[in-house]
A protein has these predicted regions:
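Short acidic/polar hinge/loop motifs at secondary-structure boundaries
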Residues: 11, 48-76, 94-95, 192
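Hydrophobic, lipid-facing positions within transmembrane beta-strands of outer-membrane proteins
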Residues: 28, 88-90, 103-107, 117-121, ...
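Transmembrane beta-barrel wall of Gram-negative outer-membrane proteins
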Residues: 104, 111-142, 147-184, 230-236
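Short sequence motifs at beta-strands and strand-loop junctions characteristic
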Residues: 22-24, 84, 112-115, 149-153, ...
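Acidic/polar loop-and-plug regions of large Gram-negative outer-membrane beta-barrel proteins
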Residues: 162, 169-232, 253-290
Length: 310
């Protein structure tokens, strides 16, 4: 499964990856030389993707990221970063900037186990008269998942409008990621793994007769938009100035069934008496939402001549 970027990097030395659903679609994680995701500095077109609070990168927010990239650079070990926190475990630098000389288009459709399907298409105008160009990429992927409730329906899109002059360039980039997946982050014990490898406790509850049921809307939903404006000017063969403006907007929610939880945890008085029976615990359906914005201005002046780079 080579859908998300961590899964695509799985064959690199010192890289270990995992996917919660077992198909490569949905939540994926990676370690480099044993360092977890919060210790890996990740940039996209020079803009840091690491979450400001957890320092993690939620790869599921931009599904099928590999389809919209022109280059990926993985640097293992301790390193510095000009656009974010320093990297303890590794640095991953990704770029969507690639101007094609000729018009082109492509379509890729694949199907796999557990009703997994990936569909991607791209179109490029190539470099037009007066230096203008445009690129478009769209991907839609779906799966039932290997473990229970690991279904996924995710989409991503890229649109680039740009201009290249003799010493100047201007590029506007829009990236969208849309996620609708089942909750799979609970994990299982070793004994459960030996009994049923596809077991997932998400949404599990029991009725008064002891029969097991599953809440049918145990979902995680998130949409993220990235808008980047990049300007570059080359003074001469040694000096280059680049400036990038970035705005990231994300919003979503997850719906989750909580069984046997204390009433006081949700601000309710305890105990509660119903039909003569006293209760201190109950079952809850929780919906937690997120709405965040991220602004960045990144400006670099670079000098490069012979073996010296500053």
């Amino acid at each position: 499964p080579l859908n998300s970027l961590p899964m695509s990097l799985n064959f690199q030395p010192s890289v270990v990856t995992s996917n919660e659903g077992g198909t490569g679609i949905g939540y994926s994680k990676m370690t480099v030389r044993g360092s977890k995701g919060s210790q890996i500095n990740v940039t996209l077109n020079g803009i840091t993707l690491n979450d400001a609070e957890s320092q993690e990168v939620f790869w599921v927010n931009i599904p099928a990221l590999g389809n919209i990239l022109s280059s990926v650079q993985l640097q293992r070990g301790l390193g510095t970063s000009a656009s974010g926190a320093g990297a303890f475990g590794a640095s991953i630098n990704m770029s969507t900037a690639s101007v094609k000389a000729e018009p082109s288009g492509w379509v890729d459709i694949s199907r796999g186990a557990w009703n997994t399907m990936t569909t991607s298409a791209g179109l490029s105008t190539g470099l037009l008269r007066h230096g203008f160009y445009a690129d478009f990429v769209y991907s839609k992927n779906s799966t039932d998942g290997y473990i229970r409730n690991a279904y996924g329906d995710v989409q991503s899109a890229l649109a680039v409008l740009g201009w290249m002059g003799e010493k100047n360039s201007l590029r506007l980039t829009y990236i969208m990621g849309n996620q609708h997946t089942g909750i799979t982050w609970g994990g299982i014990s070793k004994s459960q793994l030996e009994k049923d490898r596809r077991y997932n406790s998400a949404g599990e509850y029991y009725d008064s007769f002891g029969n097991v049921h599953y809440y049918d809307n145990e979902t995680d939903n998130y949409t993220q938009h990235h808008l980047q404006l990049n300007y570059a000017h080359q003074f001469n063969q040694a000096w280059t100035w680049t400036t990038t403006l970035n705005y990231t907007k994300g919003d979503g929610f997850y719906d989750q069934y909580k069984a046997g939880k204390k009433l006081t945890k949700y601000g309710l008085s305890s105990p509660v008496e119903i039909d003569g029976v006293s209760y201190k615990k109950g079952d809850f359906i929780t919906l937690k939402s997120m709405d965040n914005s991220y602004y960045v201005i990144n400006s670099d002046l670079r000098y490069s001549k012979n073996a010296l780079k500053v």
